[in-house]
């Protein structure tokens, strides 16, 4: 059957001290981007790839893959910006700080197809 789901543009942050805080809405919906989202040394939060919903018209067998664009939220002025394309679009994958960079491990290339790759990401 046809997938029924709604991707949201909402963005939220959580701290134990303050609970949930609503951030400015993203310019377009993104789900399943690498988590936790990488944060640069100057406080910019990055959403790298993920599912933008454009593949929902496809079956898992014909889906071309996930979004290769990235967004960033500049926490100094709380505005979203286009952060450009990424080399390896993925969704549903962990991301962690590693040796001064970020490691994005495995993830889905397209629905139902996992990647064995590990990517190292350097942020400005």
Mark where each language-model region is:
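Kelch-like beta-propeller repeat domains
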Residues: 1-124
């Amino acid at each position: 059957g046809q997938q029924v789901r709604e991707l949201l543009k909402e963005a939220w942050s959580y701290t134990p001290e303050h609970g949930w805080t609503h951030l400015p809405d993203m310019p377009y919906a993104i789900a399943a981007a690498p988590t936790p989202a990488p944060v640069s040394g100057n406080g910019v939060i990055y959403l790298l790839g993920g599912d933008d919903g454009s593949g929902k018209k496809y079956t898992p067998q014909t889906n071309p893959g996930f979004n290769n664009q990235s967004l960033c939220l500049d926490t100094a002025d709380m505005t979203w910006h286009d952060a450009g394309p990424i080399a390896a679009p993925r969704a549903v994958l962990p991301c962690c700080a590693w040796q001064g960079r970020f490691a994005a491990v495995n993830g889905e290339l397209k629905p139902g197809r996992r990647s064995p790759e590990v990517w190292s990401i350097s942020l400005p």
